[in-house]
Amino acid sequence: MRTEIISIGNELLQGQILDSNAQHISTALSQIGLKVMQITVLPDEIEAIVEALAATKQRSCKIVITTGGLGPTSDDVTKEALAKYLDCPAVVFSKERLSNLGGVDTPVIQYLERATNSSVNISDLQLGGIKNVLGTAPGIYCKQNNQILIVLPGVPTEMQAMLRDTVLPYLQSNFTLPIFYQKTICTIGISEEEIAAILAPWESRLPAPIKLAYLPDLATVKITLAATVPTWEESKRLVEEEFLRVLPLIEPYVYGYNTDTIEEVISRLLKSQKNSLSVAESCTGGYVSQLITQVPGSSVYYQGGIVAYNNTAKHKILGVARNTLLQYGAVSQETAMEMARNVRLKLKANIGLATTGIAGPGGGTIEHPVGTIWIAYADENTCYAQKLQLTNNRLYNIQLTAYHLLDLLRKKLQGK
């Protein structure tokens, strides 16, 4: 069943924002067995939208989901474009009239006649409004000539709620979707190329129904195994068998499964071990603390963080010895370890973490080029530091350092 996504908005094409909606929709659809075959990004222009919708019909696309252009401003033209594409009056898609519709699959003839005060001849069109509980712009459901159009707002929180609460349940209850089972392995500390090389012999022997996908991100790579076969039981059996074969090959790099994030895994470990945590940050400027506190309930184990950016702060606030800073410098194993030990004691935590280094793009020397970073871990019995040599990109260095540090913490908590 061919499915496509159309993302509408000048801001997407101008690079002002990322198209996170398409990513979210694609992920959600894949989890119910629908494969997105094409994603199109369009400007807020009626003709461009009409042409794109017409092209989906030429490609025999069964389901089209659009996002964006439902708001009240002059550049929100999706409803006008939809009316032109369906050859029906634009007043049909007014906010007031959509809000009065019961739901999807509403018989449309009488509705259209009431909306326009005239006789219409659109006997093959079904229309429904999709309730938007988080915003003011209702979504739109249209079915015509065996094609389903689902029109959603571009605001991510609104779109996600409507997709979850209305669209996905509708698709699952009204279509015979492919039966499939999938499992994702989440890795960190290894590149996509390195994983692919390790898995190549195993991958070459995969049964035909098994599909393998790699999803690299900043510091992680996710590997998804999926099988589409006549029964769910058979799909699960195939995936689980290959999962057990592949896991030992990359086990040192595995931090979780399916939708796990490294922060969530650490949260579970800290809670189960009744450990507490504190962080001293220099080059990461609080980013480690941000990641940790993104997890609900992190106050149970997270005591707090200290951003000590210059040497004065490192000495006066964290208590790093002047001699350490003078003899070894701020970017050193010795300073990183003192930061980790001292923040643990100052904030009365079981575990202390630290980052110090040169994020860039300036500040590097021959001895310590840009991207030279030290991360450290300290508990009651041990203290350990690790050197990283990263890139010239400041933001990348900050983010990657944080993930390296969280992975170091994970390994320590797991006794690795």
From Swiss-Prot:
It comes from the Bacteria. SUPFAM superfamilies: CinA-like (SSF142433), Molybdenum cofactor biosynthesis proteins (SSF53218). Pfam families: CinA (PF02464), MoCF_biosynth (PF00994). Gene3D superfamilies: CinA-like, MoaB/Mog-like domain. InterPro entries: CinA, CinA-like_C, CinA_C, Competence-induced_CinA, MoaB/Mog-like_dom_sf, MoaB/Mog_dom. PANTHER family: NICOTINAMIDE-NUCLEOTIDE AMIDOHYDROLASE PNCC (PTHR13939), NMN AMIDOHYDROLASE-LIKE PROTEIN YFAY (PTHR13939:SF0). Belongs to the CinA family. NCBIfam families: cinA_nterm, molyb_syn, PncC_domain. This is CinA-like protein. It comes from Amoebophilus asiaticus (strain 5a2).
